[in-house]
Structures are given as C-alpha cells and as structure tokens.
Regions:
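N-terminal, active-site-proximal structural segment of metallo-dependent hydrolase catalytic domains
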Residues: 2, 16-99, 155, 159, ...
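Sec-dependent signal peptide recognition
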Residues: 2-9
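Hydrophobic h-region of N-terminal signal peptides that target proteins for export
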Residues: 9-17
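Beta-strand-turn-beta hairpins that frame and shape the catalytic cleft
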Residues: 18-22, 105-109, 123-145, 267
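Structural recognition of the beta-strand scaffold that forms the well-ordered cores
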Residues: 21-24, 50-56, 83-85, 100-101, ...
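Solvent-exposed loop/turn segments at secondary-structure junctions
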Residues: 27-32, 57-61, 88-93, 107-109, ...
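Metal-dependent phosphoester-hydrolase catalytic domains
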Residues: 60, 166-172, 181-267
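His/acidic metal-ligating clusters that form di-metal
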Residues: 155-176
Length: 267
C-alpha cells in the first residue's frame, strides 16, 4: 500500500511537471512610463507562469529596458528567467512596436532564433513574432501578435493566419495576443475548421474607463488559439488584476488589458 501511494505521488508529480503554463498580456505602452513599483507588481503577478508573451512593448530603447527590468525582477523571485525581444515591427513609425517573450529556463528551452513574420509583413501591420520552445522532448511555437485597432478592421490582417499552419507544417503553433477581435468572428472559422480553438469564449479582456454596476470590462480582444489535435488543455483563464486597485484609473497604470493564460500538455 505504501509503495502504491509513493508510485501515485510520483505519477502526479511527473504529470504536474510535464505541464506548461503560458500567459499572454498586452502591457500597454510597456516602456519608460512603467515605474519600478509597477514592474514589481507585474513580476509578482507573473511569477507562477512558465512563459510570458508580451505585446505593445515600446519600439525605442525604453521598451527593451522595461523588459530587461521585468526579467530581472522575476529572477529575484526564486526561479531563473530569460527573455528575448523582437526588432520593431515594420509598420509606420506611429504604430511600430516590439514583442517580448520571458520564460523559466528550468522549465523551457528556447530552440533556434525567434523571428518576425516575413511573408505577410506588408499585409499585417504589426507582423507576429515567433519563438519555439521545448519542454521535455516536445516543441511548440508561440505566435505573439497585436492586431490593428477595432476601428481599422483587424480581420483584414487576421485572415492571413489561416495560411500559417501550412506555411510552418512542422511547428506546433499557438497564437497568443491581442486580436482586437472576438473569437466568434468569422475570420477565425478557417482556423477552427482545421482544428484550432480558443482558450476563452465570450470573455471580455479590455478595461473600461470606469466600472458601471461592477461591470469593468469592455471588449473580447485577448485570447490564445491552439490546435486540439496537438495540445491537451489542462486549464485556462484570465487574471482580473484590476480588482486589486481602488479604481480603474489606478489599474490602468498597469495596463488597459487583463492577462489571459493557458495551461497545457503536448500530445
């Protein structure tokens, strides 16, 4: 009986270890405007995840510096973290941004060099940023993306995502980011037809200017999409961090979006 208990405990521990938790967050103008106190708050919120995909990193030096500060703060929390930052996207000077990934090195290994999408960089204003990771002996590639605003019709660029699984047939793709578009939009149907699904359904993720009748979220923009034939969902969700603040105005100094997350294992 004791041997059976030990074996069960080992199997549970092994299963937990073999899972990966990814979090995606539009950190709104992530750069010099974020104070040390803000970066410390963000680090405390992210410390229990394995991989962080960040959108809206400022294209200038301040953006890269903020990511480095966040990684440094995470390294003070007990685990070793590394990070990578994209080149500025090829969009106009006003719209150009960077993306970033931060990950726990004892859990994940970065494979090869990350890259910005090349084939559709003219069709997609802020072309997505790819990075491949390995945990145990299996690999997956996160496609980090920030779409144009809703008024500019983000579906006109999201429509090119249906070509990406065929463009990268050997990669296990996860699409993560701020799509400025709900998962129910028909632009996602081609991906759904080949097995992709969203981690969140009908979940608003952007903050209003102020809460009305305890309703503080505005639009269903942020999500994570994955192929159900390649990934097993353990659990998924979002972090309503704004509830830790006295007002949305105060919460919005962190970001005008809430983070979304996905815990999974690979088939």
């Amino acid at each position: 009986m004791k041997l059976l208990y030990c074996l069960l405990l080992f199997l549970i521990s092994f299963t937990v270890f073999s899972q990966t938790k990814i979090l995606s967050w539009n950190l709104e103008n992530f750069g010099q405007s974020k104070s040390e106190k803000t970066i410390l708050y963000i680090a405390n919120l992210l410390r229990d995840y394995d991989l962080i995909a960040i959108q809206e990193v400022v294209a200038g030096y301040g953006g890269a510096q903020a990511v480095a500060k966040l990684a440094d703060e995470l390294n003070r929390k007990g685990a070793k973290w590394d990070y990578v930052i994209s080149d500025p996207t090829s969009s106009s000077a006003y719209k150009t941004e960077r993306y970033a990934f931060i990950w726990k090195t004892n859990k994940l290994k970065k494979i090869g060099r990350p890259w910005l999408e090349k084939k559709y960089h003219l069709e997609i204003d802020r072309e997505p940023f790819y990075c491949t990771f390995q945990y145990e002996n299996k690999q997956f590639t996160v496609v980090n993306f920030h779409a144009i605003t809703k008024s500019k019709q983000p579906e006109t660029e999201i429509k090119y995502f249906k070509f990406l699984p065929d463009q990268y047939p050997t990669l296990n793709l996860i699409f993560a980011g701020d799509f400025n578009c709900p998962q129910s939009h028909t632009v996602f149907n081609p991906l759904k037809k080949i097995g992709y699904t969203s981690t969140l359904i009908n979940q608003k993720t952007s903050l209003k200017q102020e809460c009305k009748n305890e309703n503080c979220l505005a639009s269903e923009f942020d999500n994570i999409y994955f192929n159900t034939s390649k990934f097993n969902t353990i659990q998924s969700g979002y972090i309503p961090f704004y509830k830790n603040f006295n007002s949305l105005k105060e919460a919005r100094t962190i970001s005008d979006h809430i983070p979304v997350w996905f815990e999974f294992s690979l088939n």
